[in-house]
């Protein structure tokens, strides 16, 4: 059984990838692929949403290992029910938490063929959009709004996770360069070895 974990990073077309996977359940099923969504709420409904993800990532090492076994058992049940042999979970919020999620992934590797997919993007291309999204509309930090200069320094810090992912999971990790010249959904599908029908709207892009 295989698990493909799409880990981001942010502002690299994640929403487009998730939308394509979510709306093509039948096409995926024909390839024995099942999309689990973006949260770990299959394990516990409390892990749904952004706050739930943080609760999940706050588990200690022993809890993470136990949760990984539960996750594997739940995937096994789904595989038996629907015939899937490959599962996909996509959440860009995982990218910056490589150390916290390590016990979970290390235990999972004992039970499944784990494949990680990450997209990396030139920060010049995404910082203004990220500041608007995470600094204003979906404000992550407590207290007053921060200036672009202050918030950008924090946002750019997520790149520090990239070498850790590569060093820790190099044999299981595929890193793709994201830019506007690619169709990120097509690229993701090719990377994962799956095919999806073309979108109804030509508007599925990479933003």
Predicted regions and their residues:
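A generic structural motif
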Residues: 35-40, 115-120, 199-207
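PAPS-dependent sulfotransferase catalytic domain
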Residues: 27, 99-200
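Feature targets compositionally biased, intrinsically disordered low-complexity regions
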Residues: 82, 142, 202-204
């Amino acid at each position: 059984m295989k698990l493909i974990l799409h880990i981001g990073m942010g502002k690299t077309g994640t929403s487009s990838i998730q939308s394509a996977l979510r709306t093509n359940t039948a096409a995926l099923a024909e390839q024995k692929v099942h999309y689990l969504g973006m949260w770990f709420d299959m394990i516990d409904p409390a892990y749904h949403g952004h706050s739930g993800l943080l609760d999940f990532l706050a588990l200690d090492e022993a809890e993470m290992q136990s949760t990984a076994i539960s996750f594997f058992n739940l995937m096994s049940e789904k595989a038996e029910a629907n015939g899937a042999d490959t599962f996909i979970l996509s959440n860009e919020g995982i990218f910056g938490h490589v150390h916290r999620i390590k016990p979970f992934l290390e235990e999972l590797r004992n039970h499944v063929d784990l494949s990680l997919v990450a997209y990396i993007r030139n920060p010049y291309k995404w910082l203004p959009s990220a500041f608007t999204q995470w600094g204003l509309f979906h404000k992550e930090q407590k207290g007053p709004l921060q200036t672009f200069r202050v918030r950008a320094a924090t946002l750019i810090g997520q790149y520090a996770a990239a070498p850790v992912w590569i060093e820790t999971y190099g044999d299981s990790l595929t890193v793709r360069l994201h830019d506007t010249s690619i169709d990120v959904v097509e690229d993701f599908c090719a990377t994962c070895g799956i095919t999806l029908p073309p979108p109804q709207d030509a508007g599925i892009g990479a933003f």
